[in-house]
């Protein structure tokens, strides 16, 4: 198989250094993670609701959705803990077609995973900054988790990936 090397992806630490999570935002995420842990372990009687669009491929409409969801989440906080879905990968059974924001952050340009990884990190960082939500994402590529581990509160393994040994070992 012939491949053309275009450029090296940054290592996760490089990207985290370029786009850091502030101490204040890290505290917000830690608090949310602790609440999720309490729900999963039964220490909290709250329901956990992971909700959102199938694909987060257009930033502004998703941010508008998150702002509205923030109001709803605040209204039900005593009974329901909400984690928004901000799914940036689109698994494809046939392997072709649009594969999500991580592959093609600008639909008017050619796919570019280098730009995509940075765009996804910025997207999750913006969600946390502007709404206080640490989100859920389906990581089609388990190794990408290291780019977003300080931002995500929930990571999903999708239906097309459950039989993949790499995903199962990562989970």
Regions found by a protein language model. Give the residues of each.
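Conserved, mostly hydrophobic/aromatic
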Residues: 52
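Glycine-rich anion/phosphate-binding loops
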Residues: 56-76, 110-123
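Active-site-facing alpha/beta catalytic cores
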Residues: 7, 79-171
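Acidic (Asp/Glu)-rich catalytic clusters
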Residues: 40-43, 70-77, 125-130
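N-terminal start-of-chain detector that recognizes signal peptides
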Residues: 19-23, 55, 107
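N- or domain-start disorder-to-order transition segments that initiate the globular core
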Residues: 2-43
């Amino acid at each position: 198989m012939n491949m053309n090397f275009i450029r090296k992806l940054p290592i996760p630490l490089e990207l985290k250094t370029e786009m850091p999570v502030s101490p204040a935002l890290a505290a917000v995420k830690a608090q949310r993670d602790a609440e999720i842990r309490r729900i999963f372990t039964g220490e909290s009687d709250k329901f956990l609701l992971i909700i959102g669009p199938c694909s987060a491929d257009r930033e502004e409409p998703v941010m508008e959705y998150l702002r509205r969801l923030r109001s709803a989440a605040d209204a039900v906080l005593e009974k329901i803990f909400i984690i928004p879905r901000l799914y940036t990968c689109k698994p494809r059974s046939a392997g072709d077609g649009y594969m999500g924001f991580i592959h093609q952050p600008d639909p008017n340009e050619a796919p570019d995973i280098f730009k995509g990884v940075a765009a996804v990190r910025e997207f999750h960082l913006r969600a946390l900054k502007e709404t206080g939500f640490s989100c859920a994402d389906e990581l089609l590529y388990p190794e990408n988790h290291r780019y977003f581990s300080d931002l995500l509160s929930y990571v999903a393994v999708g239906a097309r990936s459950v039989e993949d040994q790499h995903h199962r070992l990562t989970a």
